[in-house]
Amino acid sequence: DMYDEILKQGSKIVDGLSSYRQPVFVHIPPAGELRGGSWVVLDSQINARGMIEMTADAHSARGGVLEAAGLVEIKFRADRQRATMLRLDPTYAQLARDASEASGPAQAEARRRLEEREKHMAPFFHAMAVEYADAHDRAGRMLATGALRHAMPWAETRRYFYWRGRRRMMEVRYLHACLAA
């Protein structure tokens, strides 16, 4: 990336879009993802005039800085996973109580059973965490946070952009005419 000057070109795009005076439409198509630096470059909040509008497919588009699995690796480490297991898994909670109350060889056996249960349940809790994180990357959540203007099925996109483009161009034309007067 450094050799190809990707970051330098991305910053030029951000500079250009932040001062752009015409409407820009960004659409995430079905099964499309907008991640990482691309998300930052095309974020609708970088233009103070509100000229950038982001839309997405309502069913399968994803967007965000990190992928769900990467977010889980950062935010849901082993200690938090154990705390969640303790809160949600009654068997794990009982084994943890047994391990803390026991002493000597009984404590070693109780800890072994606790670790065994943790290893058994860890994949399930990891999968739930990834699904939860992925739910925050879907169109519904992006709409709720204001990152998207509209989420629509793929069949409606052509009609939507035709009419939205016409309206935005007229709005901009009238705005420039009023400012020039």
Predicted regions span which residues?
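Ligand-binding clefts of soluble mixed alpha/beta catalytic domains
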Residues: D1-A181
